[in-house]
């Protein structure tokens, strides 16, 4: 889903605030020699050890935390041995264990309390590693240092305890120093989150010298680049206060984000990280609806009731998040495509395409028309008809095709046109109720005369404060007509209901929430096309229309 050219806020990856530009000065100081030489990680390991309050021999610099996790399993999880871990967890933990050909033993538990007894019950002579995240991803919960020490003390000496502490700076407790006293423990740290250096891929394994020495043999000798080491080292020497200021900002804003989520029907989990996990009745709607508005959040297929949202990094981002969530809960306006959403055009516009093609000797079935519409760039039925004829080898101008189409649709002389078969899909009562709550608008590719006539004939014209037609702006999928509708309605947030990928793409480009509508008689093909185009939700016009706004 691509929200046009608007700025996208990515709150799906838990990345930190970008560091100050001053950190780039180090590259200028080093010059091109930094790129020529193989990089020595020892100064970085010493600086990070000093930051943690331990010896350099207890620290191994790795290519991000993922590399550290991978090394732990390659070193301490033999093929066929078991990795015991509370679940859900960071996906790279089980992924790396599988790559080492280890067997997974997941432990379901009540989030927030370390399942000490369940973990110990699962440990056997085949156990190689017990893996724990604190604070946890994706739940955001943290385990107490005491509970970790109690678990470590109870594990057999040959079992390695891996504690992923990627979010430790954001938590109330940092168990690093306590776990450094546990010979079998290895901690995973990173500069991707609180330090804002995810692009450098700088991580660390921290533990007893004997364990760290073992890990050194399970990776390349130059795991980090010279620029990565130089910038990370500079941040450790000059950026600690900056990092801690950002951490305090996140801690102060977590509850604000949780409050916003509660206001729109979410149930947020307590968090000690830089993100909040929240459950919703329809989490997929939240994720896709926010993406359409240019705010990316994380949805988990294995946790289908939840979305995870990184704490916005400044007030401007917070306002975008609040507006996007508010729109999903209660938009200012509802924008309707006409054909297939308000008007049942199976026996009018769609049939006009069929009969116009037939008049040129070409058979065009409804399945073909559905496929053309689903492919996109098909909001102009005159152009669609001309394209079908051209594909069949008919040499006719667009003007000729349009004239024939209009004869069929409008009627000629004593021959009534197909437009007489058009009916209103939603009831007038439903539209009237919506008009009492929202500003309503129509965004259609129809000529104004046809659109206005249909609305008058169906006695609903007075319910729509804006009717945008082909004369007003470029046709969808261009977002321009949607933006014109927003301007005329004086609305900042809206849902756009449409039955084609062009409607969805126009909505996304304009920053409004696209709701796909499967028109009467539509099948699975239309549903799939709407979903692939980025519809945040899909409903069937003749069954779900009213319920969409009352669920």
Name each model-derived stretch:
Residues 75-132:
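PLP-dependent aminotransferase-like
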Residues 1-67, 71:
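N-terminal small-domain helix-loop-helix segment of the aminotransferase-like
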Residues 20, 184-262, 266-268:
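PLP-dependent aminotransferase class I/II
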Residues 496-539:
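Acidic, Mg2+-coordinating phosphoryl-transfer loop and its flanking beta/alpha structural elements
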Residues 111-171:
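Active-site phosphate-binding strand-loop segment of PLP-dependent enzymes
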């Amino acid at each position: 889903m691509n929200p046009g050219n608007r700025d996208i806020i990515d709150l799906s990856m838990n990345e930190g605030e970008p560091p100050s530009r001053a950190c780039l000065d180090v590259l200028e100081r080093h010059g091109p020699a930094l790129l020529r030489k193989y990089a020595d990680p020892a100064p970085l390991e010493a600086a990070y050890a000093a930051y943690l309050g331990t010896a350099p021999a207890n620290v191994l610099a790795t290519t991000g935390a993922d590399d550290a996790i991978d090394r732990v399993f390659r070193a301490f999880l033999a093929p066929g041995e078991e990795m015991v871990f509370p679940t859900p967890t960071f996906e790279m933990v089980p992924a790396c264990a599988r790559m080492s050909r280890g067997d997974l033993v997941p432990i379901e538990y009540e989030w927030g309390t370390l399942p000490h007894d369940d973990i110990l019950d699962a440990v056997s002579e085949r156990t190689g590693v017990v893996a724990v995240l604190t604070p946890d991803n994706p739940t955001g919960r943290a385990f107490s240092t005491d509970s970790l020490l109690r678990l470590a003390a109870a594990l057999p000496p040959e079992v390695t305890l891996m504690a992923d502490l990627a979010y430790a700076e954001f938590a109330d407790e940092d168990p690093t120093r306590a776990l450094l006293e546990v010979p079998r423990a290895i901690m995973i740290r990173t500069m991707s989150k609180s330090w804002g250096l995810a692009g450098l891929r700088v991580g660390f394994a921290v533990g007893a010298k004997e364990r760290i020495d073992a890990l050194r043999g399970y990776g390349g000798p130059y795991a980090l680049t010279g620029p990565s080491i130089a910038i990370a080292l500079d941040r450790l020497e000059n950026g600690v206060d900056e990092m801690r200021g950002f951490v305090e900002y996140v801690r102060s804003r977590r509850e604000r984000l949780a409050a916003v989520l509660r206001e729109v029907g979410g149930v947020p989990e307590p968090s000690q990280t830089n993100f909040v996990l929240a459950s919703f009745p329809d989490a997929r709607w939240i994720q896709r609806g926010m993406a359409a508005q240019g705010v990316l959040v994380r949805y988990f297929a294995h946790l289908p009731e939840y979305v995870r949202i990184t704490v916005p990094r400044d007030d401007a981002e917070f306002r975008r998040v609040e507006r996007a969530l508010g729109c999903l809960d209660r938009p200012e306006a509802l924008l309707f495509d006409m054909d297939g959403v308000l008007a049942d055009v199976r026996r009018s516009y769609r049939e006009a395409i069929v009969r116009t093609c037939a008049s040129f000797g070409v058979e065009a079935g409804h399945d073909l028309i559905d496929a053309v519409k689903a492919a996109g760039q098909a909001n102009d039925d005159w152009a669609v008809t001309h394209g079908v004829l051209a594909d069949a080898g008919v040499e006719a101008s667009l003007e000729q095709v349009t004239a024939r189409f209009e004869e069929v649709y409008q009627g000629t002389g004593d021959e009534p046109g197909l437009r007489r078969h058009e009916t209103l899909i939603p009831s007038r009562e439903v539209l009237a109720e919506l008009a009492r709550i929202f500003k309503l608008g129509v965004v259609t590719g129809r000529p104004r005369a046809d659109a206005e006539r249909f609305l008058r004939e169906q006695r609903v014209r007075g319910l729509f404060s804006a009717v945008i037609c082909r004369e007003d702006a470029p046709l969808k999928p261009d977002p321009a007509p949607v933006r014109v509708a927003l301007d005329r309605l004086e609305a900042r947030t809206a849902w756009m209901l449409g039955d084609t990928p062009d409607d969805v793409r126009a909505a996304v480009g304009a920053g409004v929430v696209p709701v796909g509508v499967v028109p009467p008689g539509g099948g699975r093909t239309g549903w799939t096309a709407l979903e692939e185009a980025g519809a945040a939700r899909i409903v069937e016009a003749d069954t779900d229309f009213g319920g969409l706004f009352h669920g």
